[in-house]
């Protein structure tokens, strides 16, 4: 098999601009809390699940490095009684190169980066809930593009100083 014509790096042929490149440097659980007051409850009905999602991106000190934090809060109740409360912040450190303007950086960091983190966070949520004695909670995929568009429409599209 020939590797001719294969370009593994972000460099582009001469005369053409380099393509944007988003690379995962690290991923980790930043914060995790699980409260399980309903562990002894025998579930016969499907619980009511409230899910909240929050997303932040910030520039790190090193050039082209950013931290993206995806937070999920799950509040499960049955007949008005709390079953469990799960809060998890899952973060990734990303290297983003060849994106000169802040608006495009922000779009990539708030759409593509969380899309890359989500499967890992989803597994953590399912495992923690299952280990708490409940059936695993499989979170539906999140439309990060729609979240980004809603954020921009609300005027939160401009990042605070020092973030992207």
Where are these regions (language model features)?
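N-terminal intrinsically disordered, cationic/polar leader segments
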Residues: 2-116, 122-164
